[in-house]
A protein has these predicted regions:
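Amphipathic alpha-helical/coiled-coil segments positioned at domain termini
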Residues: 105, 111-150
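Feature 926 captures the class I aminoacyl-tRNA synthetase adenylation module centered on the KMSKS loop
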Residues: 1-95, 99-111, 118, 152
């Protein structure tokens, strides 16, 4: 049986999204067979080691929690965050990342924000950094159940 196909970078993102919890990472890869999951466990351990020992700082992230300080957003940014939250709630789990990316740009343009500024705001809100993994894919990997509570803080 062939190994489960997931790019190492994506696997590293899952490891960070789920704070290194191997079983939660595997639960997101629900189409993997049991034998593939055994091999994935080894790859997950390799990803953890790479993140710990070799990953550049800009590659590392952790999702914000209720204990983290809120980003000081202006009125338009708050409206854009709330619009984006609505799009995540209503559409994220119903479409692929390419389709969903249109809603990212819509949340920015509907609130008078340049795309680059909106991306900076959303990354800061989600991971406390101005840049991060490709946004649509990252949000899709996290899932609405993870992203919505963070966005609803605003």
């Amino acid at each position: 049986e062939p190994g489960y196909q997931i790019p190492f970078r994506h696997l590293c993102n899952y490891v960070q999204i789920y704070s290194g919890d191997t079983e939660k990472v595997l639960s997101r890869l629900s189409d993997a067979t049991e034998s593939q999951k055994e091999r994935l466990r080894v790859r997950i351990e390799c990803a953890k080691a790479w993140l710990r020992d070799y990953a550049p700082e800009e590659f590392k992230f952790s999702l914000q929690t209720e204990n983290d300080a809120l980003y000081e957003a202006n009125e338009n940014e708050i409206k854009a965050i709330r619009d984006f939250c609505g799009y995540v709630e209503n559409y994220l789990d119903k479409m692929d990342e390419r389709e969903f990316s249109n809603y990212i740009y819509q949340a920015a343009s509907d609130n008078g924000l340049e795309n680059a500024d909106f991306f900076r705001v959303i990354y800061t809100v989600l991971i406390g950094k101005e840049k991060g993994p490709k946004l649509a894919g990252f949000v899709k990997a996290c899932g609405s159940e993870t992203i919505v509570p963070i966005l609803k803080r605003y």
